[in-house]
Amino acid sequence: MTNETSDAPAATSRGGRASYGGAASLPRSTPPERGLDPAAVGRFLDAVQAREVELHSLMLVRHGSVVAEGWWAPYEPSGLHLLYSLSKSFTATAVGLAVEERRLSVDDLVTSFFPGRVPSDVHPYVAQLKVRDLLSMASGHHEDTLERVDRHDLVRSFLALPPEEEPGTWFTYNNGATLMLSAIVTKLTGERVLDYLRPRLLEPLGITDAYWQQIPDGDGGDPDLRHLDLGFSGLHLATESIAKFGQLFLSRGVWQGEQLVAEDWVRDASRVQVDNPREPEPDWRQGYGYQFWMGREGYRGDGAFGQFCIVLPDVDTVLALTSATENMQAILDCVWSELYPALQSEDGGTGEEASAELQARLGVLTLPLATGDHNAGIELPWLAASPTTGRQEGTTRIESIEEAADGWRLTLADEHATYAVGCGFQTWARSEVEVWPGARLQVAASGAWSDPTTFTAEVAMVQTPHRLTLTCDTATGSTTAQWNVAPLGPTSPSALAFRLADD
């Protein structure tokens, strides 16, 4: 559950534009000016908090203008945030741009792009697999192929996995399919997906800051695939960049009078291409487009732990959210119950006073700080009696605590690296550390002594949804670690670092 007290930046007032991370911002307005009752946004925030959902940011775009925005400290407007599977919608858009440039069509056979990688005994279903089947998660495989491919020869091993069903007839959420789309774009263009998107999509949208994790050594000896973005995950963007992407699709591919993405592509990507009735949650069984989910209302790209780009054409609205929750359906339930009914009206509510109250609330959001005392019951600096040796997978520990301005300086050790971070008392202290050569991690930490020999630190990896609660028993030197939501992949903080080679 989140609390709402901090000195995080307030929402920008109406009119004017801001610039976060060098990107020209969307126009700003107020909810009443765009026909929305500010109380509906407040009810949404209340409902999410009641469901104990941890939001990190929110941006609501109504009739083309931002009418509500907020970041829960230590998250900030300019900060990049891992999108997880929301990345897929950007990969599909790269395919759409390549289709518009006549580099391929959605009816091209997947094997046609990789003649040297096709097994001699290729399965007939693989031989008939089309680009559209990858886009719509209808490759025919019953299970995600990602865990079954050879990470050193991704394309060949994917093409060696026989689908159980005829392509185009069976929906399975398949990260391997999106990885193949990334490989196709890279093979055709000679560029990784991120670099292909920069001049065609990101820069025209004013998005200058983006990072996409690559797959090391997955090319199988193919020089055209040496720089391969994950495609299915790994893209990091600021919240406003997510909102701009949604607004582009809401506007049928037009941005400031320029058709950046073909209208036909937007239409096809955002309508049902395959049914998915076996999905358990109501907003995940409304059908699937080209790497977009259909919802009970509108459509969306989304990623693990609550990264959302929700597009609602019927009410001319886009909602961008970043979060850390395993209950993504709860967020959408709150959208439908609290926000959507108000969006169906043009009633601005009680006017500017209510709007000012909402902006004040959005300006002081924070995640919970560590609670306790500033003074230790032991002499500092404190050092663990036995520094980490033979680090165990998935473990993180505090190896030293020393006093510093506004708090402490902590030495942390995980299975991959040892590094020092600042830790604030009753505030968030930010650090950027090089966890190993060429890999940098942005951290914000808050700490306190819960008793004379127990130190607790909240350590947020602020370019991701993930935060560690570290509790150090200085009497024994032991540390317990608990994630808010555990990363999908290696569960050590250093594994979440940006690798400069991927920039």
Where does each model-flagged region fall?
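Peripheral terminal and inter-domain segments
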Residues: 352-503
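A short, well-structured edge-of-sheet supersecondary motif
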Residues: 40-76, 316-320
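Active-site SXXK
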Residues: 64, 81-107, 134, 181-185, ...
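Active-site-proximal alpha-helical segments within enzyme catalytic domains
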Residues: 177-184, 231-254, 307-324
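Active-site Gly/Thr loop motif
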Residues: 222-223, 227, 267-319
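Structured C-terminal helix/loop/strand segments within mature extracytoplasmic catalytic/sensor domains
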Residues: 5-8, 303-369
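Active-site helix/loop module of the DD-peptidase/beta-lactamase fold
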Residues: 82, 101-139, 160, 188-232
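Bacterial peptidoglycan biogenesis and beta-lactam-recognition machinery
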Residues: 97-104, 181, 186-194, 202-210, ...
